[in-house]
């Protein structure tokens, strides 16, 4: 194939949790040497969906009917499928993977995707990052395979069908040629149709004329092939929006005390303040993520009524939030990583205060921020002018955090409309009852 060099700037890690369903159950019970499987209804029959190592060693495989599996292995322990619990677990694992990069997405039902482009050097390189990832995932009790490539399709294929490993940038075509067509993430029906005419591996279709291939088997085959080879872009959809600013701190020894957490918050806020000041911005919403040593992640958000940069103000916000959490933070065996992220930032240019300035509203802002953090954002409200001549619609009550941001915009819009329409001023007095107008014939 002439155009076989990937132009992707991604560096994708595909983490495949092959036995996610059985591993989840094994973590919740005492060690049991008997073979285990998860079964679910597919059509009119119960089908084997997942197997542990002992069941695979007995010759069982996915796709067998439950009756066949029991005939082959009478001692098989079978669990019912629980897709919602498995999906929550996969999301929790993906959430934990954000310790490596904010660009983390799901490869459901049993995979996680990470884009480590630009951040692998923080862990000593790609190999060191993958070693740390695999060590931690296995310590949590999950069997995992990992593939690293310049595209989502190639990383997915090498993790699940190519025994894992790294694909150097631009070498996707060379590594994928020997893999089965199912590695392209095409439907089983399409794979079967291709197999009937003798196409079983990716290398069998790479150099075929594209128009006849698309006409007979659909454009999806070519699309997935081009995506795997990096000839067509495929963005990774992150689990959470990527914060414009964030700072993090790993801990050689896990921390658990609240005073240590607050000290870390202030230290990270200083680093964020420097970033924000360079761009003339301040934070409006900030999130604290605490990564526990056992894989659980605690996230706490706080908001402000105006853009701020002062580290002590950020610390004060979280003092109130930590004191009023409905579900207090359980540190477990401690947190080994803390990350402070600015999720919403606004312009906050520096200004010089002179003796002629009007009263500063900083104290009012502090009051709004702290009471909102303690009582809840919806419990502290403010009236905001609206562009309406109906008195009962002339103002609305909004949470103070959003209201103070919209206050100037609301008044400005109202004044501009009145000026453009050349409307008279509102009357100082409204009659309780409208007078009747007499009609003269």
Located regions from the model:
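DNA-contacting surface of Y-family translesion DNA polymerases
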Residues: 14, 75-76, 191, 195-335, ...
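Residues that scaffold, gate, or flank divalent-cation-dependent active/transport sites
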Residues: 1-113, 118-120, 127-128, 132-135, ...
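Amphipathic, charged-and-aliphatic alpha-helical interface segments
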Residues: 58-60, 172-207
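Hydrophobic (often cysteine-bearing) scaffold residues that line and stabilize catalytic clefts
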Residues: 86-89, 125-129, 221, 257, ...
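Flexible hinge/switch segments at interdomain interfaces of large molecular machines
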Residues: 106-108, 170, 239-243
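Hydrophobic alpha-helical positions that pack around
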Residues: 125-173, 178, 303, 314-328, ...
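Short, conserved phosphate-binding/catalytic loop or strand-edge motifs used
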Residues: 109-114, 152-155, 189, 208, ...
């Amino acid at each position: 194939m002439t155009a076989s060099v990937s132009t992707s700037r991604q560096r994708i890690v595909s983490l495949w949790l092959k036995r996610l369903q059985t591993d989840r159950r094994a973590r919740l019970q005492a060690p049991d040497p008997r073979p285990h499987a998860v079964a679910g209804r597919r059509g009119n029959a119960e089908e084997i969906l997942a197997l542990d190592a002992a069941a695979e060693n007995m010759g069982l495989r996915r796709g067998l009917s439950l009756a066949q599996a029991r005939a082959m292995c009478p001692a098989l322990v079978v669990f019912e499928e629980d897709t919602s619990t498995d999906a929550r677990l996969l999301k929790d694992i993906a959430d934990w993977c954000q310790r490596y990069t904010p660009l983390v997405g799901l490869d459901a039902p049993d995979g996680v995707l990470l884009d480590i482009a630009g951040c692998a050097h923080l862990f000593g390189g790609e190999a060191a990052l993958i070693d740390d990832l695999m060590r931690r995932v296995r310590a949590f009790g999950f069997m995992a395979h990992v593939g690293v490539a310049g595209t989502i399709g190639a990383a997915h294929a090498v993790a699940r069908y190519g025994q894992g490993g790294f694909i150097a940038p631009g070498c996707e075509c060379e590594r994928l040629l020997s893999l089965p067509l199912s590695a392209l993430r095409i439907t089983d029906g399409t794979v079967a149709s291709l197999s009937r005419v003798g196409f079983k591996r990716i290398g069998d279709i790479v150099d075929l004329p594209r128009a006849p291939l698309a006409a007979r088997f659909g454009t999806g085959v070519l699309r997935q092939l081009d995506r795997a080879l990096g000839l067509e872009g495929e963005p990774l959809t992150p689990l959470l929006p990527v914060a414009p600013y964030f700072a993090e701190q790993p801990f050689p020894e896990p921390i658990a005390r609240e005073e240590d957490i607050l000290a870390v918050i202030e230290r990270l806020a200083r680093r964020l303040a420097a970033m924000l000041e360079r761009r003339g911005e301040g934070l409006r919403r900030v999130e604290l993520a605490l990564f526990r040593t056992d894989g659980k992640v605690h996230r706490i958000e706080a908001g402000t009524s105006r853009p701020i940069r002062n580290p002590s103000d950020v610390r004060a916000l979280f003092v109130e939030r930590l004191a009023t959490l409905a579900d207090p933070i359980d540190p477990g065996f401690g947190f080994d990583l803390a990350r402070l992220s600015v999720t919403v930032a606004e312009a906050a240019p520096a200004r010089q205060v002179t003796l002629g300035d009007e009263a500063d509203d900083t104290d009012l802002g502090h009051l709004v921020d702290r009471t909102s953090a303690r009582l809840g954002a919806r419990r502290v409200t403010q009236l905001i002018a609206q562009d309406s001549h109906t008195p009962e619609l002339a103002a609305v009550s909004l949470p103070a955090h959003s209201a103070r941001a919209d206050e100037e915009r609301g008044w400005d819009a109202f004044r501009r409309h009145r000026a453009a329409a050349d409307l008279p001023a509102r009357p100082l007095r409204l009659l309780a009852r409208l007078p009747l107008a007499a009609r003269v014939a």
